[in-house]
Amino acid sequence: QPNIRKPSEVMKLERMGSFHPSRLSFSRILIRKMIQQKTRISCSRWKMDKNGFGNAVYQLNLFGKNLALIAFSNHIETSQRTDRVIASAWDTSFALFDGVPSISDIERLKTQLPFQEAGRYKNTELVLSRANKSVRMFELVAQSLSEGKQPPSELINDIGYLMRTTAVYGNGKFGIDDRKNHSDLSDFSVPFQLEMLTVYLIRGFSLDLVNHIAKARNPKKFVPLDKKIQRYLGIGNATGLGMAPFLVKHPVLLNNWFQVRETALSRMIDLAELSKEKAERLIELTFRVKAFINSWNTDDDRQKKRIDILKAEWVSLINEFTLEKLLKINALKNIFNGSKNYSTECQELIVSLFLEVGGDL
């Protein structure tokens, strides 16, 4: 039985809200699978006008299964653009499709997807989603590229995405496919893999769309968005409205997720000796973490204070991550026990750091 932290310690809202992404996060699991499978994504259809309105299809094969993202980009009035759940129009709408879509599939979804919940769907649709542009960011990036220059780094750091999803629906919602009916989807049994794949593809679509619009404005001066900036940009998420009731209604599922995370942490803490390779990797990651948290921006005063405290704590904590100290007996256990003197944000960042080098465990 692993020596894991007590539920009374872990299952506190303050601590849960302080969790950081780790190698056990759903999106990270998906990316590892795609790398292992050497997945290639191709844009098989791009029917966009000069203003970026139209449709596109992205195809890929994962675990021997053909999948496609069908994307629609539509003009909407500024007054219609809202991230609230009561919205009835969005800049873009998407479906993750089971197989290779035909022209008739695309035409059918063209009349349904923009209506989202009000549309009618078949079991070939695995996931539905919609997204709005970050208008200020999207327009500034498009205009900069059309003038032959890269967008200002300050804006990229401040916002960090071109589009934000306002919903991602899967697993039987609104008449789409219920995955329990498909044994050939067993490789996607880890929670939210298809949803995360959809969001990953939407992110790629947003980059292609801004490049397309910029080039259409000024083909002679246009330069594509720098690859480093493309790698930095993510995808925004406007709401988390369904998260609270989902967690309340699925306690066993929540327990399983936490059990995996805490078990993995206990295996790392219980390592009597750390290999030199792992120690060097940890040292490298501590400096990457420092650069990462220094780039964080938020308008929330409470969270800003927490981040400021975390920044100061991390500068102090880095002194514990030397090769000499990490190669001592029970080094990780000593660091972890010592972290209890730091903020919850810092404690949970250390958890993610430890997990990062423990993939073989």
Annotate each language-model stretch with its function:
Residues 1-49:
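Charged, amphipathic alpha-helical stretches
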Residues 1-13, 89-361:
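Mixed-charge, Lys/Arg-enriched low-complexity segments
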Residues 29-90:
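Amphipathic, interaction-prone secondary-structure segments
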